[in-house]
Amino acid sequence: MNNLQYRDFIIVGILLKDISLHSENGIIKDNWIYIQEPYVKIARIGIINNWSPYMVKDKNCIYVGVEYMCFENDELWSMKEDDFIKFTIDEMKKLKLIKDEDVISSNIIKMKKAYPSYTGVYNEFHKIREYTDKIENLFLAGRNGMHRYNNMDHSMICGIEAANCILSDNKDKTVIWEVNTEEEYHEVKSEK
């Protein structure tokens, strides 16, 4: 099953003096802003301060994670880090979210295979599960292990359930595979 497909991921962290995302009570309270504008490649902006006030040392600053979905070795992935950071700042300026003088510092992280894709041979993944479920001491978990779009909480629950199976000598891994199967949770394309 070498043909399972993934999207890769680049996140640029930018520490800012200000950002044009305010409500009457200060910065907006959203954790993520999904970007749909066709003239930029940004997929999502995470406002790290909103996850926890302890995530940013200087309470007068805003730290954002600007996210890009890409493929390893494509145009975005292949950019030099300094060029990519400049590109990201330029995109944030195109969105009228920041000005050059707002930027204090930045960093970049690239993650291969961050997002499992439900394309290609994904419809044959059950063969992997059937094979690996027979290996008593092997428990698949997380996005890459299960080739499933699990969030951190789902991955942690899978790990806890795997530990429970081990501790109780339970060979049935169904409880692990049932994590993140709630239909109301998933984002699906609606038919109009």
Segments and roles (model prediction):
Residues M1-D82, K86-L97, T174-E184:
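Mid-domain catalytic core of redox enzymes
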Residues N2-N3, S20-S23, S52, S78, ...:
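Generic serine detector
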Residues R7-F9, I27-D30, Y39-Y54, D100-K134, ...:
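FAD/FMN-dependent oxidoreductases across multiple families
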Residues Y63, Y68-M69, T88-K94, I98-D102, ...:
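A short, terminal or domain-edge coil/loop segment
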Residues F71-N73, K113-A114, G145-H147:
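Short Gly/Pro-enriched loop/turn and capping motifs at secondary-structure junctions
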Residues I109, Y118-K192:
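C-terminal lid/capping helical subdomain adjacent to the catalytic/cofactor pocket in oxidative enzymes
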